[in-house]
Amino acid sequence: MASLTRKDRPMAAVKKSVSVKDVARLAGVSEQTVSRTVHDSPSVRPETKERVRAAMRELGYRPNFAGRSLRRGKFKTVGVAMFNITGTGNLDRMEGFAAAADKHGYAITLTKVDGHPYTLESASSRMSALPVDGMVVIMNRMPADFGTFEPLPGMQTVLVTMLEHPLCSTVDNDQFDCSRQVVEYLLRQGHKTVHFISCPERSLSGMQREEGWRETLHAHGIEPPRLVRGDWTAQSGYAAGQALADDPTCTAIYASNDAMAYGCIRGLESRGRRVPEDVSVVGVDDSLGDIVPDRRLTTVRFDNRRVGMWAVDKIAGAEGGASGVEHMLIPGVLVEGDTVRDLR
């Protein structure tokens, strides 16, 4: 049996892509009106917009924003690189990213930074392959190339860190000042010194909180007691509390985060030390108040949502020419609970 030649074969039905012209024809309007409706222009009457949108739905028309972005050289998108997506404060920062992006008509693209050690260059390379106008990097740890990193031309870059970079804008909560506030507060309450539960040495925020603790005690002529190293978890705080419970001179403990502070309280109590009657405890981040109902921890509250909004505002503002490097530190607020005793 002779086979069909290509010429003899019936052609498969080809679905024709829907164009602006098709939508305009069905809606009975101009192509310019369709374009204005897509961008929600106030110059188009509501009833006309509804007619155009009905035609778009009927025809299955989807605006080609990607093509428009390529033509304009702008994607209206900010890339966010995180080392630890579930880290304390990151969800609030994401809320800030989203709120600012919505305000500017931008979208957010999220990527996770891996690698040991990770670098800003690797984050930048990944972002350069994506349709983004700028990137935000949350620096939980010190990148190996922090001192040598140069952002790509046209890639507005904001780093979430207290460390200032000559070529990138930076924003963060003031990790040093939160420790100063805590130590000053406890000393004003009559405590002679402040013990400290630190965190993993690779953590940037933890290092800055430790530095603030040391320098504030030194400023008052007090030699800092030996710190206890934790790992951000309540379990490490529990172990630290048990260890510090055996020190009769310990009347005040400052933990690097709320999880360790709550763990510390349980550790102290397991050894018969009462909080705050025997030992005062203060944390940082105000992240667990809704989760631990039986205790109002004295802590420092951070505005991570504001951090996220500032970062995206900076990148979106670059579209209007505000592209200079800036550095922003947002102070925390000391929130008094029921875990500190006044010894005066």
Per-region residue spans from a language model:
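N-terminal helix-turn-helix DNA-binding module of bacterial transcription factors
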Residues: 1-75, 344
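Alpha-helical recognition/docking segments in bacterial nutrient-uptake
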Residues: 1-15, 77-184, 188
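Short beta-strand segments enriched in small/hydrophobic residues
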Residues: 26, 33-36, 70-86, 185, ...
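Short acidic/polar active-site loop segments enriched in Thr and Asp
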Residues: 30, 76, 133, 191-194, ...
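Glycine-rich phosphate-binding loop signature in dinucleotide/nucleotide-binding domains
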Residues: 59, 129-131, 189-191, 244-250
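Hinge/beta->alpha junction and helix N-cap segments in small-molecule ligand-binding domains
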Residues: 65, 83-92, 110-119, 141, ...
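Flexible loop/turn connectors
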Residues: 225, 247-344
